[in-house]
Amino acid sequence: MGAPFVWALGLLMLQMLLFVAGEQGTQDITDASERGLHMQKLGSGSVQAALAELVALPCLFTLQPRPSAARDAPRIKWTKVRTASGQRQDLPILVAKDNVVRVAKSWQGRVSLPSYPRRRANATLLLGPLRASDSGLYRCQVVRGIEDEQDLVPLEVTGVVFHYRSARDRYALTFAEAQEACRLSSAIIAAPRHLQAAFEDGFDNCDAGWLSDRTVRYPITQSRPGCYGDRSSLPGVRSYGRRNPQELYDVYCFARELGGEVFYVGPARRLTLAGARAQCRRQGAALASVGQLHLAWHEGLDQCDPGWLADGSVRYPIQTPRRRCGGPAPGVRTVYRFANRTGFPSPAERFDAYCFRAHHPTSQHGDLETPSSGDEGEILSAEGPPVRELEPTLEEEEVVTPDFQEPLVSSGEEETLILEEKQESQQTLSPTPGDPMLASWPTGEVWLSTVAPSPSDMGAGTAASSHTEVAPTDPMPRRRGRFKGLNGRYFQQQEPEPGLQGGMEASAQPPTSEAAVNQMEPPLAMAVTEMLGSGQSRSPWADLTNEVDMPGAGSAGGKSSPEPWLWPPTMVPPSISGHSRAPVLELEKAEGPSARPATPDLFWSPLEATVSAPSPAPWEAFPVATSPDLPMMAMLRGPKEWMLPHPTPISTEANRVEAHGEATATAPPSPAAETKVYSLPLSLTPTGQGGEAMPTTPESPRADFRETGETSPAQVNKAEHSSSSPWPSVNRNVAVGFVPTETATEPTGLRGIPGSESGVFDTAESPTSGLQATVDEVQDPWPSVYSKGLDASSPSAPLGSPGVFLVPKVTPNLEPWVATDEGPTVNPMDSTVTPAPSDASGIWEPGSQVFEEAESTTLSPQVALDTSIVTPLTTLEQGDKVGVPAMSTLGSSSSQPHPEPEDQVETQGTSGASVPPHQSSPLGKPAVPPGTPTAASVGESASVSSGEPTVPWDPSSTLLPVTLGIEDFELEVLAGSPGVESFWEEVASGEEPALPGTPMNAGAEEVHSDPCENNPCLHGGTCNANGTMYGCSCDQGFAGENCEIDIDDCLCSPCENGGTCIDEVNGFVCLCLPSYGGSFCEKDTEGCDRGWHKFQGHCYRYFAHRRAWEDAEKDCRRRSGHLTSVHSPEEHSFINSFGHENTWIGLNDRIVERDFQWTDNTGLQFENWRENQPDNFFAGGEDCVVMVAHESGRWNDVPCNYNLPYVCKKGTVLCGPPPAVENASLIGARKAKYNVHATVRYQCNEGFAQHHVATIRCRSNGKWDRPQIVCTKPRRSHRMRRHHHHHQHHHQHHHHKSRKERRKHKKHPTEDWEKDEGNFC
């Protein structure tokens, strides 16, 4: 019975609860029906939207029609009641009733009720474009009669706009680089609406930057000189309009959402960049990007400690400005390397770090490995390694093509660059199928990823597997890159003309954290691809990277070592062993549709490699490399113009010498040294190894690699030759130069080359035709000089590295094969040179000569060795053509038979460039100081260094001038001796005519040009020549190699006492506050009254006795001042330092509620309220403002009847010169200004008597007392007697005279100080 009873009782109670709930619900419906107004509160949390977007704040309600309320339409009111920080606000936005919407002035144009006219029950507010200050709490209130409903809608505006500057310099980003910089900063490039929204919130930045629509703009809220733009003195976003994507500016980025947390890491010992990365990883995070730090700052992060970020920059976020935290405005501060606010700190410097931990882990682009060695090159970009994205389609992007003003190559078609690359996917980008396209890699930084193979892994290679790709043409020249060399010098490199870039094509995929990377700029448009049998890959010119894996650390899987070796950019560990073959160079021509690889990779194999370069000039450029034991460096400097010699045969007394485009560089060997010579001819026919061959076309020449033994003339098969343990004992110094050759021999495949004991071989019998290169390996007992950071004692450390010279191609335009309309046309694939009717004018290329008469010429490679090198000297006439001599090194005494007559010497081929008229090449040997050689020296070796030679210098050495032409380059090559010297020989019938202006003399001479002839120093800088080098002494306000940088002199805040600094050309100007003077505002021209303290042009005094606010203001006015106003954080800190009690200030809203005004009628420019203030808490009103002492002087509104101390503020006080008094003068020196309470004394002139007080005082209001002194002449005795007699005689008539007639003395004249009553009290 118990259980059924319990169940019955439970059911009964449930029915009662349901009945009560139903009654309550019916009552609620009835109440709502009776009210007739019901708000539909969504309660879905905050509304979130991004900056500059539109957002709808919902407000829905229902109306029940009632006869009594038929004419009573609902009144809708939107109000913002709280800010994002939680401070109370009551800002009316709009009011709507009877289809009439009235918007508050500050919200006009930004808010609307889109559905209200049609549906009065839908009061949804449409707000936008959003600003960051729009975040907060909004209230929608609907009133009908006595019915009142309201709902609160929180709004959160996400995203922040920030300015980004490259690590290289101000204005150093193209449009593509700007997009990449923003992406690597966890952001996107900002749109104009983003920048406008940021400006409307007070964003002010005088740096022009890219926006997403390819316009360049910058926001200015306060106009100032240098920042007027297109809006003169008006505030607004300045615009340069739509710009060429290759122009250089900064960028404005937009970061939308953080997606994690940014936290500060401040260990006891500060960190280098590498240490900061490791510290973040240990905490399960990564270094934060710039965009992530800005978002964290936007969300409230405040930390006055500089820390590393992922891009190598050092920054810190400031919410509340304070002393020693970077300025008076909130924001993210940046620590720059140089005084002109450019450059990031060196990775070896120590700072704290800011790490980012994602809520949902995702791949972070920001934390990419960059070298942190002290020998690394400068960080060329502010962002890390960029990921090259596929080009968008033609419909989306504007294709910019350079103008062609001259005919193309002689075949009538443009030569195309075939990029041989291993890749996964492709995308086609071609204007029209079938059209040839001049190929080069797009402008931007290129990152090279390298994986060094182990010597043990260098086995037999396989045929290269590659895809053919064509990259679009770069329409504009590039700027110079800077790379740090072994000796601390910075080497500069500049790209060739568009479409003619040569060098290495780099990986477009950013390396992983394990990869060894360094940024290389500019990109070089030559791709090298090879697959090892073990699966490893290696870049043939790994010296372009800073970080290379340890030798021997590779595995069969091709994985790199987790702890790579760090090498300077101009070095590469040796990777060519005795088991290896040279890279195969391949030239191809492509037409029709083409595409850029999505993720191209670079691979290097000592066995085989495929190299693609622009066909017109395969010898244009290849990387610089040096050996650690003897640096052999090529340095490109500019801008300069050089006068170059014509290639022409001249005679010599020594053995016959021919010049060519091939070069080697060796160190002077000891008697025990061995020399190995390798040759890389570029063939036009298929070659292979053993039974293996790689098919090519006649238009795709290949390169073979031949090795020559030192002691045996017998042929050595490549597969049979080996050398033991080259790593610890062989220092390699490799110089590779390319020269085209032509022979008629049919190819038969790879074979050994007969050699001699001298290590010199004849390549005339080579079955190939193409580019010639030599490689020297010297087993050198000399001690090695290692770069900083390498351990020479480590058995795994490489003891040498190949040295590869960089030979830039210089052309005046995009058509390198045509010099002039009358000049000859040269095809590198033909053996015939067809000159035009003109005489010596023409373009000079390696392996080609121009003659007055048209005749066929056969070019063949020859090798000649001699100790004397003859360099032609030419005098250039107007309109002559000049060329770029290919590099050559010096040989030992040996010779090879030549088919040409004795004593005939030909110069090497050159690259053409026009010389401006009225320029000549001065002759003679320059005086070159030790340590700064500018050409290859015979007999001794030297290295480019900052003023100190590394090896002995012989002033008597013959110099080989190697210079460039109109493109404003200087190529400086230092070579050792002895070595191998090989030249190109011209085989032709008849005698070659001498070129105009070319002396047919013998001997070693050189061309010397004054580098200061055209004064490359800008802005009035002084050029100081030092041989073929120069330096600029810059005037004040300028810096840089050529004084091209205008330093902002205002960065160091030279103006004192609150003066405003304005930067001008070669100087600055200080605008001083009132009462200050001098060029730095250092002179205080006006002072304060006694007991008052001066600060930035005003006087302040703290009164400790307590008064009500109104009485305190009256007391300040009696003292010619007011309760203090505050207009800057500095002024606030100064006032807050007076006392330690709550203090009255002059801010109040006694006239209009919430309309706070200063009593001295100055504008409200600065606010420092406590949290949730002002709140008008008391019912009686809180109309006066007090500084709260225990909260750093923050403001609070309180009732005005409190008795508190106060601070008065007034202007500075000084009196001018004292007023002049007739017949009197001042005692002492006369001053222009007198301090308050100063006293001066008058003295009557001689012969005058003084009456009344002779002193006056400077009053506290800046005015003098009114002078009382009167100076008069004394009466004479006879006049007194005559006057007395006259008085007695007329005494009886005295009463008949008027008062005026009876006056004894005339009224004294009016003093000048009485005429100006306004100057006195």
Swiss-Prot record:
Disulfide bonds join C59-C140, C182-C253, C206-C227, C280-C355, C304-C325, C1012-C1023, C1017-C1032, C1034-C1043, C1050-C1061, C1055-C1070, C1072-C1081, C1088-C1099, C1116-C1208, C1184-C1200, C1215-C1258, C1244-C1271. This is Neurocan core protein. Residues 1084-1213 form the C-type lectin domain. The gene is NCAN. Residues 38-153 form the Ig-like V-type domain. One of its GO terms (cellular component) is extracellular region. Coiled coil: none annotated. Residues 1275-1308 have a biased composition (Basic residues). GO terms for biological process: cell adhesion; central nervous system development; skeletal system development. O-glycosylated; contains chondroitin sulfate. Residues 1008-1044, 1046-1082 form the EGF-like domain. May modulate neuronal adhesion and neurite growth during development by binding to neural cell adhesion molecules (NG-CAM and N-CAM). Chondroitin sulfate proteoglycan; binds to hyaluronic acid. Keywords: Calcium, Cell adhesion, Disulfide bond, EGF-like domain, Glycoprotein, Hyaluronic acid, Immunoglobulin domain, Lectin, Proteoglycan, Repeat, Secreted, Signal, Sushi. Residues 1213-1273 form the Sushi domain. It comes from the Eukaryota. Residues 1-22 form the signal peptide. Residues 362-414, 456-479, 494-513, 532-579, 682-731, 820-844, 876-955, 1275-1321 are annotated as: Disordered. Residues 708-712 are annotated as: O-glycosylated at one site. Glycans are attached at N122, N340, S381, S411, N1026, N1223. Residues 935-948 have a biased composition (Low complexity). Its main location: secreted.
